[in-house]
Amino acid sequence: MAKLHITTWGCQMNEYDSSKMADLLNSTHGLELTDKPEEADILLLNTCSIREKAQEKVFSQLGRWKNWKKDKPDLIIGVGGCVASQEGEHIRERAPFVDIVFGPQTLHRLPEMINQIRSGDRAVVDISFPEIEKFDRLPEPKAEGPTAFVSIMEGCNKYCSFCVVPYTRGEEVSRPVDDVLFEIAQLAEQGVREVNLLGQNVNAYRGETFDGGICTFAELLRLVAAIDGIDRLRYTTSHPIEFTDDIIEVYRDTPELVSFLHLPIQSGADRVLTMMKRNHTALEYKAIIRKLRAVRPNIQISSDFIVGFPGETAEDFEQTMKIIEQVNFDMSFSFIYSARPGTPASDLPDDVSENEKKDRLAHLQQRINHQAMQFSRLMLGTEQRILVEGPSKKDIMELTGRTETNRVVNFIGTPNMIGKFVDIKITDVYSNSLRGEVIRTEDQMGLRIVESASSVIARTRKEDDLGVGKYAVNL
């Protein structure tokens, strides 16, 4: 059987896309996925352009693959993702041995591209933006454990001055709501208990309904939570200016929606937020968090931060540190600013020294880590409900799972617990994980009421004096 290797860099959207590529090429070409690139007949590189020197990283990797192509002339090499979308034909100008260049919105055309190369075409470059077409061409989802990612939309319309996403993934396009619900229902039938909705800006979701209407993100959350078998619901990533009150109401009355939110702010200084074109203030961000905690007091908040943005002063950075303390963030993805080619911010003078950037980043991360450890210590001795994902990476004789607030917990258990919930008493706290002992299995929780088929069939419709229908069991 021919083999496929995919190297993936970047966000969860890229991870999701890579899994779909693997499933697609398995169904169309019988390709078996391998983690050993030297064994592969097709090599795909799914790239990310968010970080500094993304392009050079790509060509460095391609240079290693070039040597294998000399020994195996029929080897097909493809480059996809956001760097491919940015660079297009320039990739082949620097690396003419690359056979296929495709963007995030054209990965569904890979089977045809591969056939073209095998038919003798020199190269194929397709980095177009065909709306949401790719989701219509992908195979049925395959569950790999009790958790799954589902993409609900692509692209972003916000055009933050530092961000390449609108240029590499296009503007916001939402999947029809029925398509999203059908994919999640299929995953639930395969044993998925937790689903994570993906998009560059998920709370801007506006999916078309079967009757031509529009489903908002808040409505989608309620619909997904109602799918039988889905007991936990997460999403990433969202934008503060789209975080409307109807979403907050879902936190009030939908227990399936976890008490964890990743809501990027990037900076705590209004002056910097304006230069970033974030279109909100620090005060408006804090107002969202205040409303959330009014309906879900135990919710944990994580965020993204960029330090050393052009023009960021020491006072601006102190404003960021201040909001970190005020919001009491539990976690963060924080980075030193680096200009992305083609973005408005790349024209600004990069006037913060590298040493200052590094100092600020270290200071920020130290503060976040301190707060995270405080949250973890508060969990010591408490009971936490864990969705068991599988064997622990640190010790295959142990199991691992996550709390509702996204904490990793390792514990001693039995294989039949995988894919189910267990209640754990937290006994130890570490920097990146917790440890505990099982005090209750899912069978002991009474999560689901088992009802015989005959009792369901026995339900009959009865009307009251007003003609209102009710279903009751004949006794």
Swiss-Prot record:
Location within or outside the cell: Cytoplasm
Keyword Iron: yes
Chain ranges of the MTTase N-terminal domain: 2-119
Gene Ontology cellular component list: cytosol
Positions of the Radical SAM core domain: 142-374
CDD domains cross-referenced by the UniProt entry: Radical_SAM (cd01335)
Record InterPro entries: Elp3/MiaA/NifB-like_rSAM, Methylthiotransferase, Methylthiotransferase_CS, Methylthiotransferase_N, Methylthiotransferase_N_sf, MiaB_methiolase, rSAM, rSAM_horseshoe
Reaction catalysis annotation: N(6)-dimethylallyladenosine(37) in tRNA + (sulfur carrier)-SH + AH2 + 2 S-adenosyl-L-methionine = 2-methylsulfanyl-N(6)-dimethylallyladenosine(37) in tRNA + (sulfur carrier)-H + 5'-deoxyadenosine + L-methionine + A + S-adenosyl-L-homocysteine + 2 H(+)
Matches recorded under Pfam families: Radical_SAM, TRAM, UPF0004
Cofactor(s) for this UniProt protein: [4Fe-4S] cluster
The record's free-text note on cofactor binding: Binds 2 [4Fe-4S] clusters. One cluster is coordinated with 3 cysteines and an exchangeable S-adenosyl-L-methionine.
GO molecular function (one): N6-isopentenyladenosine methylthiotransferase activity
Domain of life where this protein originates: Bacteria
Enzyme Commission number(s): 2.8.4.3
Binding annotation for [4Fe-4S] cluster 1: C11, C48, C82
Principal cellular location given in the protein's record: cytoplasm
Residues the record lists as binding [4Fe-4S] cluster 2: C156, C160, C163
Domain TRAM: 377-440
Enzyme class, UniProt record, top EC level: transferase
Family designation: Belongs to the methylthiotransferase family. MiaB subfamily.
HAMAP family in UniProt: tRNA_metthiotr_MiaB
Function (record text): Catalyzes the methylthiolation of N6-(dimethylallyl)adenosine (i(6)A), leading to the formation of 2-methylthio-N6-(dimethylallyl)adenosine (ms(2)i(6)A) at position 37 in tRNAs that read codons beginning with uridine.
Assembly information from the UniProt record: Monomer.
Protein name (database record): tRNA-2-methylthio-N(6)-dimethylallyladenosine synthase
